[in-house]
Amino acid sequence: MPCSLMKVDAKIVRLLVVVILLARVAPALAAGCSPAVASRSAQLHLAAVTAPGTVDVTFLGHASFFLQSPGGVKIVTDYNDYIRPDFTPDVATMNHAHPTHYSLDPDPGIKLILRGWDTGTGIPHFHERFGDVQIRNVATNIREWGGGTEYGGNSIFVFEIADLCIAHLSHLHHTLAPEHLAELGEIDVLIAPVDGAYTLGQRDMLEVIRQVKAPLTIPMHFFTPRVLENFLTLIASQYPVQRAGGSHVTLSRAMLPRVPTILVIAPERGG
């Protein structure tokens, strides 16, 4: 074979190798928590119908949210014995700052229960795959009732669903250190407690929202409408506020706003 043809054949082989490698890498990049943001629209649009590439989000109450993936995986955050869904989720996450964030008697039909604190085997570090959902956690500390600190007593759970990264802060008691932010990665939707008392002061929670820089933040854990409105007044000059007009929204990457926005979802039962 002439040398010129051999050179062409070698180039073709190298090109094919590159194409194969890219094909293998692309799905992993799409599933990660640092996706490109160029496709974010200028305005958040709320949908009411589940579709491929979307996440159904329902605010059950207090710190419990029901997330449903395109593949039908049902997740309930801060699953507890006070505000329970009328169905059995596939996955339940819990934290233990207060009994309203965990259950002593979870539904035996739940397939995966993730307790976000040290239950006797050390601070948990979850990396779980369930159906089309990836779940991990970032451990944080909480104040103890008698004073002092319980290290790793709370977990920020991160749910990677439909090309969105959703972080639920649960009962966060402090602003985030650089190592927490590095573990979190790029977050698209932040669910944040705004009570201003049992977790963080509202100004400190505002600082956490600034730290995370999520396009969308959903307030939770506010107990009463007045507490929520106090928080919205505090942030009014810094973030636009949209109200869902109900307890349910459907989110997708294309719906994320370019400007960081606060989205208020009404709890089904108690804030």
Residue ranges of model-derived segments:
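Short, conserved loop/helix-junction motifs that constitute active-site signature segments
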Residues: 84-87, 105-110, 183-186, 208-213
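Bacterial N-terminal signal peptides that target proteins for export
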Residues: 3-16
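N-terminal signal peptide c-region/cleavage motif recognized by signal peptidases
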Residues: 25-26
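Extracytoplasmic/secreted cell-surface and envelope-processing proteins
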Residues: 102-103, 176-178, 198-203, 226-230
